[in-house]
Design a protein with these regions (language model features):
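Glycine-rich phosphate-binding loops at beta-strand->alpha-helix junctions
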Residues: 245, 366-386
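Active-site neighborhood for divalent-cation/phosphate handling
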Residues: 76-178, 368, 398-401, 423
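Small-residue (GG/TT-enriched) beta-loop-alpha framework at ligand/catalytic clefts
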Residues: 3, 12, 22-32, 69, ...
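Phosphate/pyrophosphate-binding loops at sites that engage ATP/ADP/AMP, CoA/4′-phosphopantetheine
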Residues: 59-72, 231, 353-367
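Glycine-rich phosphate-binding/hydrolytic loop that grips phosphoryl groups
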Residues: 166, 171-174, 219, 226, ...
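Non-catalytic, solvent-exposed interaction/assembly segments
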Residues: 1-105, 109, 149-151
Length: 433
């Protein structure tokens, strides 16, 4: 195993932005440099990296501009067609039996067309668990070999040494849960709102319990704005960034939790992994364990049909209010009307995941929801989710668990971009946990 570095750079290559965070190990860990730069257009999509040369050139520039000189790197591996993660309940067994189970199950259930994969698994030891329980939990990761090789190739082009290739749910667990002791007392849901995908990861007492990925993100909101307002997507994206806001006074009236009858409805769990039959062997493989591959991010789900927009026509002015609205306010209403069905769908999927977690973890309840990623800072989104789900919701702060000593950027810059840096900081924290 590679020697644990004292300083490492976490690298998060997204479809819109490349994010880097340099962390020095310590108690507490120290965040020494960060950087964010646009991903070259067309170089990365929902399935993974398409243009390694363009990504490598952009990453090399970003590291130089950010003052990051360390060579030890932890890369995030992501993409709905590149990586999956599962938390599985399997019969309790010894390591040799578990290895056989995993080898057989991974070969039977590889979710990719190309069978060449890297995989890893780890037994989950939860605080206070009953040693006589007939079952145990295992976190399983499977990554496309080509995706792993692509990251190693990029590291070589940039002159980096890949200490580890990690996955988003565990990185978010480090930056938002493990580095913040008060977050380890109960269950927390982390919603990472990206451009092409949204992840829902639930942690119980600091440990990953339920990872899920939805194939929907900010780009779908951009397309919704473009279609409703009949604009080019580039203009719609700019309008979304400038004006997207949850207008609470425009939300259709409903029950406190946005479901018939109030409270949480009983979902069909469509798109949520089913509870496996008792006694059935479950998934995985050690198949040439990959150095540093920590468990990946969930499997893309087939999204439910988006409900028709409740805004079939422009709202009539309320009595006593002027009939005409300022142009900017009217435009903001139009943008909200365009994205509302997607926000409603997001809330439905969060609720579905919460109910699934509750069904599998008797007595455990989610105390709060944390938002990160580019969509996390849509004004009032946290309030909308909290009101709809009935769980306190806020924008996550990955800076709470580290000491800030960033040399190239002021604290204001780092704080204002913290929601984008949660994965990169979690990658940089890899040697610390």
């Amino acid at each position: 195993m590679a020697k644990q570095p004292s300083v490492a750079v976490g690298i998060d290559i997204g479809t819109r932005f490349i994010k880097v965070a340099e962390v020095r190990a310590g108690k507490p860990p120290v965040l020494t440099n960060v950087g964010i730069a646009p991903t070259p257009e067309g170089a990365v999509d929902a399935g993974g990296i398409l243009d390694k040369n363009a990504v490598a050139a952009a990453l090399k520039r970003l590291l130089a501009e950010s003052g990051i000189s360390t060579k030890q790197a932890i890369f995030s591996i992501a993409g709905q067609n590149a990586v999956v993660v599962r938390v599985l309940e399997v019969p309790r067994m010894n390591p040799s039996e578990l290895r056989t189970h995993m080898d057989w199950e991974i070969q039977r259930n590889i979710p990719f067309a190309d069978p060449r994969v890297q995989s890893a698994y780890e037994i989950v030891h939860r605080p206070g668990e009953d040693p006589n329980d007939p079952n145990m939990e295992v976190v399983l990761a499977v990554a496309q070999q080509d995706a792993v090789d692509g990251l190693v190739d990029i590291a070589d082009k940039v002159g980096l040494e890949p200490y580890a290739i990690d996955v988003e749910p565990l990185a978010l667990g480090r930056s938002l849960i493990l580095s913040q002791p008060d977050m380890q007392q109960g269950a927390v849901a982390v919603i990472n709102l990206g451009a092409n995908a949204t992840s829902i990861d639930i942690y119980d007492r600091g440990l990953l319990s339920f990872p899920r990925v939805l194939p929907t993100g900010g780009d779908m909101m951009t397309r919704a704005v473009a279609e409703r307002l009949m604009l080019p997507e580039a203009e719609a994206e700019q309008l979304k960034v400038q004006l997207a806001e949850v207008l609470m006074d425009q939300v259709p009236l409903g029950t406190p939790f946005g479901a018939p009858g109030g409270g949480f409805y009983t979902p069909t769990l469509g798109g949520v992994p089913p509870t496996p039959p008792a006694g059935m062997p479950f998934a995985g493989s050690e198949s040439a364990p990959m150095p540093g591959l920590d468990m990946p991010g969930g499997e893309a789900e087939t999204p439910p049909e988006v409900p028709p927009s409740p805004f079939a026509a422009e709202p009539s002015p309320e009595p006593g209010l002027p009939a005409a609205q300022p142009a900017a306010d009217a435009r903001k209403v139009q943008v909200f009307q365009a994205i509302y069905p997607l926000l409603e769908e997001l809330v439905s999927e969060i609720r579905r995941s919460v109910e699934y977690f509750r069904s599998r973890h008797t007595g455990a309840d989610i105390g709060q929801i944390l938002l990160c990623g580019g969509g996390a800072v849509i004004p009032n989104l946290d309030q909308f989710i909290a009101t709809s789900i009935g769980i306190p919701t806020s924008v996550a702060n990955p800076l709470r668990g580290v000491q800030l000593n960033v040399r190239r950027h002021g604290p204001e810059y780092v704080a204002s971009h913290a929601h984008l840096l949660a994965v990169a900081i979690g990658m940089g924290l890899h040697p610390c946990f």
